[in-house]
Design a protein with these regions (language model features):
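Internal hydrophobic alpha-helix adjacent to the cofactor/substrate pocket in enzyme cavities
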Residues: 170, 295-323, 329
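C-terminal auxiliary extensions adjacent to catalytic cores
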Residues: 334-370
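Rossmann-like NAD(P)H-binding beta-loop-alpha module
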Residues: 134-176
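FAD-binding core/adjacent interface of flavoenzyme oxidoreductases
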Residues: 1-4, 69-150, 238
Length: 370
């Protein structure tokens, strides 16, 4: 008798499993995919969409269509809680879904700094759909007057968002906005000085200000307050601080890593629930901490597919090897990128062209199964 596989999220780590969904159905298993939207947006191309390099259609995958086309069930909802002992997921709608094997690719989110409910013109960089709303709102505001846009966060996300806002607004009628990054105590602190200085050079040459006078303590509509007590008036605020995993695992009492991600072994399997797997930003790999970059989710794809099938069929599991150093390219807007791979570091148009080629190839590969 077939079993029930449930996938939470249609992100990068589930792409191969989604493409091969029919193989589970052919073996007599049921598959249910639960996601907050009929589409999954590729976050690596999100800043480019903000800057209008890409259209929304170019960076999204038709999750519902792909699932239903292969005989699976798609539920547009969010997982709110996991009842691990009962092997049941409680959804935001109040519905419940039971499972035999479950896999999480639930992503991560940007903490909202205890924002008031009525805060206006404050947008987080995730989910990616928010970037579309932010794009329209920024264009609406800059058409009226000169505005100041603040980006909270000092990592790659803030750099890419700042560069692509510059691209979005540089040819609009009226005065260009002032763009300010509030980077805490140090900009791009996770990276070597030569990387951060190259990115900083590109941004500051465009008039983008990078503030390293301390962390933002609080956010209100139209204003941020730094830890020093200094305030800054802003017309539009982006939250681009470091992302954290979905809190669902900690809330369910499951074993988690220090960041709250589902703690998984070398098989991408929960260390205390053998029927539970995961990939991408929402897990914590027990053997070694992994950076929250899409390359690991892509590398996890085939292993996760194999192990989900193996768990359903009672076959041996396959180990995940994170691999060595990875290519990192930042899209800073204006057709300019910064590329880093081991000892190689370069900036300019060629870096962006390489990123654009890789990203479009990745999307076309999975959009082809639609």
């Amino acid at each position: 008798m077939g079993k029930h596989l449930v996938l939470i999220g249609g992100g990068h780590a589930h792409m191969v499993t989604l493409a091969m969904l029919h193989t589970f159905i052919e073996k007599g298993h049921r598959v249910t995919v639960i996601g907050p939207s009929d589409h999954h947006y590729y976050s690596g191309m999100g800043p480019g969409m903000l800057g209008k390099t890409y259209t929304p259609a170019e960076i999204r995958f038709k999750t519902r269509h792909v699932v239903e086309k292969q005989g699976g069930t798609f539920v547009c909802d969010k997982a709110d809680n996991i009842l691990a002992e009962e092997k049941t997921v409680l959804l935001a709608s109040g519905e419940t879904v039971s499972y035999d094997v479950i896999s999480f690719n639930a992503g991560s989110y940007v903490p909202r700094l205890d924002l008031p409910e009525d805060a206006q013109d404050v947008y987080s960089v995730k989910p990616i759909e928010r970037l579309m709303e932010a794009q329209a709102r920024i264009l609406e505001l800059v058409a009226r007057k000169k505005i100041t846009i603040g980006i909270l966060g000092g990592g790659p996300s803030s750099a890419e968002v700042a560069g692509n806002i510059w691209q979005l607004t540089r040819n609009v009628r009226g005065p260009a906005p002032a763009i300010k990054i509030f980077a805490g105590n140090r900009f791009m602190s996770r990276f070597p000085d030569n990387v951060s200085s190259k990115i900083q050079k590109v941004l500051t040459q465009r008039g983008i200000e990078i503030n390293t006078d301390g962390y933002v303590q609080s956010v209100r509509s139209g204003m941020v307050t730094l830890a020093s007590g200094k305030t800054q008036a802003l017309d539009f605020i982006f939250l681009a601080m470091g992302v954290v995993p979905n809190p669902i695992f900690k809330n369910a009492g499951l074993a988690t890593g220090p960041d709250g991600g589902l703690l998984v072994n070398e098989f991408l399997q929960s260390i205390d629930r053998p029927e539970m797997f995961g990939g991408g930003d929402c897990i914590y790999f027990q053997k070694q901490p992994l950076d929250k970059v899409g390359v690991y989710a892509v590398r996890q794809n085939p292993v996760l597919y194999h192990n989900l099938m193996a768990a359903l069929e009672g076959e041996p599991l396959q180990s995940f090897d994170p691999g060595g150093d990875y290519l990192l390219i930042f899209n800073l807007g204006g057709g300019i990128g910064v590329l880093r791979k081991r000892w190689l570091l370069t900036e300019g148009k060629i870096a962006f062209v390489i990123k654009d080629y890789i990203d479009r190839k990745f999307m076309k590969k999975f959009q082809a199964i639609e």
